[in-house]
Amino acid sequence: MHLRVEVTADRRFGTNSYLVEDEETRDAVVIDSNLEPDLVVELARRRGAAVRAILLTHTDLDHIAGLHELREAFGKVPIAVHEAERDVVEQGKPLRSEFGPIATQIDDVTTLAEGEIYRAGTLEFEVLHTPGHSPGGVSLKIDGYVFTGDALFAGSIGRSDFANSDGSALVEGIRSKLLALADDTIVYSGHGPATTIGRERKTNPFLS
C-alpha cells in the first residue's frame, strides 16, 4: 500500500479536512469535514479516489459542517465517530452551546472505539481515544501517520476551557498514546501545519 495524504483548509476557521488515499487501489477516506466541503470533494474527483468512509476526530461544528454535502457527493458512505459524540451527528445536538443547533441529523452513524482497527477498503486505521478537548476526541493512526484532530497541534495542544473539556485528560492522552508513537510519525492536526511526534516531544511547551 502506498498512501497519499492531501489537505484542504477552509477560510473561516482554517479547519483541515484530509483525503487519505491508497494510491494502488484508489480507496480513500475523508477525515473531518470543514466549512468548505467542496474543496475535498473536488480533490477526490480530480484524484479519481473512491471515498469509502468519512471519519470524524471529534464533532466541533467546524469539523462536521459539511457532512451532508460530502454524503451527497460520495453516496451513503459510512460516517464514523466516537460513541461519546454520536448524538451530535445523529440528533444535531451541539457539542458547544455557543454554536446552537447543528443541521446534521444523520441517523446511521458508525461508532469508533479505543483500540479498534477501522477498515475502509484497503485502508486500516487504529483508533486512539484522546479525549480532553472533547469527550469523544479520537486520533487515527495509519502506517507512519496520525490524525489528531484538535488534541495535538504543531507547537500546541487543544483548548480545554469548554464546559465538557478536561485539560488533565487531554495531556494524559497525548502523553500515553500519541507520544508513545515513533518519533518520525507524521502528525496531521485539525488546524495548522503538519509536524512529527519527535518534534512535539522535544519542543512543544505544553508537554515539557
What residue spans do the PLM features occupy?
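Active-site HxH/HxHxD metal-binding segment of metal-dependent hydrolases
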Residues: 35-119, 202-206
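A generic structural signal for alpha->beta connector loops
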Residues: 2, 76-77, 108, 124, ...
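Conserved beta-strand hairpin/beta-sheet module of binuclear metal-dependent hydrolase folds
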Residues: 2-47, 139-149
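Short Gly/Pro-enriched turn/cap motifs at secondary-structure boundaries
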Residues: 8-10, 74, 107-109, 129-131
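Conserved S/T- and glycine-rich ATP-binding loop of Class I adenylate-forming
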Residues: 20, 57, 130
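Residue-level detector of beta-strand structural context in well-folded domains
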Residues: 18, 110, 115-116, 138, ...
